[in-house]
Amino acid sequence: MPAGTAARAWVLVLALWGAVAGGQNITARIGEPLVLSCKGAPKKPPQQLEWKLNTGRTEAWKVLSPQGGPWDSVARILPNGSLLLPATGIVDEGTFRCRATNRRGKEVKSNYRVRVYQIPGKPEIVDPASELTASVPNKVGTCVSEGSYPAGTLSWHLDGKLLIPDGKETLVKEETRRHPETGLFTLRSELTVIPTQGGTHPTFSCSFSLGLPRRRPLNTAPIQLRVREPGPPEGIQLLVEPEGGIVAPGGTVTLTCAISAQPPPQVHWIKDGAPLPLAPSPVLLLPEVGHEDEGTYSCVATHPSHGPQESPPVSIRVTETGDEGPAEGSVGESGLGTLALALGILGGLGVVALLVGAILWRKRQPRREERKAPESQEDEEERAELNQSEEAEMPENGAGGP
């Protein structure tokens, strides 16, 4: 149940109970003392009275003793017959009854229905938008209220007037959480709107209400936002995989309609000028392609604030192995075959060049030896002549001695 409905139902039940039971509805702030008077009770002893209560602290009716007891820290009877709750809490919500006999001997009953409340801090709009775009959904912000009891409600206002969600141009997402220890509530309300074109600078605010009498709502600081006209989407592009749109029979073709626009437009597909009966999607998958899938494809993007925009067409063609144009998967194989052939030719030329070089080198070796042989013979003749001249000089030197 939404927090607002729960609060209104609580107020209605409280009013009906007071009317039917003839009791009095009491609201007390959490943590503050509360005094309930016992009607008809004498202000001074001797007194004949009885207080009993049924609250979150008890499983059934609890009768309090005028002489005091363990419950004095929670609720105790004062000398004048009134009941004091030193510090009310959520567990003190419930029914309190007093039965007293006045001086005339008449019995008087008092009934109280006690509810507690806690006023939270001032609500706040977190993550507010800096501007709004016309004709498209925009998140205005999130209104947050912390530390309330009961939960209460959050409401949005536009230019000072209550903004009622319609589920179309005005959307509100609410969330209510309760602290497991304190029992206090935290409320969050996210507002999304679709501004109209040509609008001015709208002012948004949020308010919190406990739904109790004589309690004024708490308001956030207002935020004023600028509404800008949506610009035309950029060019639409149709991507195809495999590139070129050529595929072997049984292969897969993926068509992607790429367009930069916010919010994303609806994309429909066209084949050979006729719309395809498919759900809107920016991706078209063609598995196990056959010749019946051949044709010209294009995509049409429809933006809320602009007319439809069609992409340039692409052609899908199914080719058998050996046909003109390589089939999908054969491009890499033919490329590798060509590379291997080129490497084989280069390797063969290299071997031939090595053989020719070896043959030429072998032919040049005998010529070099022939050239070296005469040179060595002349050297020997020169050496012989030198030796003869040296031998002739030696006797002459011997004859000239003493």
Curated annotation (Swiss-Prot):
| Effect caused by changing residue 389 to E | Phosphomimetic mutant which does not lose the ability to reduce DNA damage
Report the principal subcellular site. membrane
| Gene Ontology biological process terms, A to Z | astrocyte activation; astrocyte development; cellular response to amyloid-beta; glucose mediated signaling pathway; induction of positive chemotaxis; inflammatory response; learning or memory; microglial cell activation
- List every stretch annotated Disordered: 295-332, 365-402
**Extracellular topological segments:** 23-340
Task: State which residues carry a glycan (glycosylated).
Answer: 25, 80
Tell me the compartments it is located in.
Answer: Cell membrane; Cell projection, Phagocytic cup; Early endosome; Nucleus
Span-the-membrane segments of this chain are 341-361
Membrane topology value: Single-pass type I membrane protein
Q: Does the keyword Phosphoprotein apply?
A: yes
Q: Which domain of life is it from?
A: Eukaryota
| Modified positions (Phosphoserine) in chain numbering | 376, 389
Does the keyword section mention DNA-binding?
yes
Annotated SMART domains:
IG, IGc2
List the Pfam families. Answer: C2-set_2, ig, Ig_2
Q: Please list which residues make up the signal peptide.
A: 1-22
Q: In which tissues is it expressed?
A: Isoform 1: Expressed at higher levels in the coronary arterioles in type 2 diabetic mice (at protein level). Endothelial cells. Expressed in lung, kidney, brain and heart. Most prevalent isoform with the highest level in heart. Isoform 2: Expressed in brain, lung, kidney and small intestine with the highest level in lung. Expressed in brain, lung, kidney and small intestine with the highest level in small intestine (at protein level).
What residue ranges lie in the Cytoplasmic compartment? Answer: 362-402
Q: What is the effect of changing residue 376 to A?
A: Reduces phosphorylation. Abolishes phosphorylation and ability to reduce DNA damage
**Miscellaneous field:** Reverses DNA double-strand breaks in diabetic mice and improves lung and renal function.
Q: What is this protein called?
A: Advanced glycosylation end product-specific receptor
Encoded by which gene?
A: Ager
